[in-house]
Amino acid sequence: MTTTMSDVSSYREMPAPSGMHDRVACLWRFRQAGIAGAPVRVLPDGHIDLIWDGRALIVAGPDTAAAMASIDDGAVLNGLRLAPGVGAGLLGLPLHRLANQRVALAELWGARANRVEDALAEGQDPAAVLLALCAGAVPDPRMQRLFGFLQSDEASPVTGLAAALGFSERSLRRRCQDAFGYGAKTLDRILRLQRFLKLAPRHAGLTAAALDAGYSDAPHLARDTQQLAGLSPRALLAQHGR
């Protein structure tokens, strides 16, 4: 979950505790202090999040394009971003069933989620509660390896990854849809966009940054930023640059 914020809103990430990096990517906290109900742009990043909004636990499913979230002025969100390859096993369903959706955890877990929400409503620390939910999660090592391949600055092409991971092409497609909510090619596009945001500050121009991130040329970058983020490359960097 990568957000666009007003100048007075705040977003802070905290690293996962030692020993949980294979299950938790990070913890985060967002406070909305802009115009009431002003939309917040959430970029796809290859992850899913568990979010406590003060009333309910929400699962932010895997996005294939930017989502616009309406958040009340003064609202505080506490979230946990799951490590890749963890969500399907933890939640108990393939992630393609949650693609581009925000779903109450109670719809998936029933009374168990209600008990956790009661503890949060009574004032228990959201970070500690969210971490406890993930303590028994079992990562999928081959899906984590795939994510690492595609996320790296020297990203591997999708072609050939199935054999490297010990899958047929068909099995890889199914496993990716279960683990990430979409196929490897979509994951590759999403992680390339995130890589562009990471690498852009190193370059004076957009074309050099695009090539470094793995785009074939500047028009390729422009197509992907429009389709995935709903923004031009320059607008994307202005709103989400690191």
Task: Locate each region found by the language model.
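Alpha-helical bundle regulatory/interaction domains
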Residues: 1-160, 164-169, 179-184, 198-201, ...
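DNA major-groove recognition helix of helix-turn-helix
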Residues: 176, 188, 225-226, 237
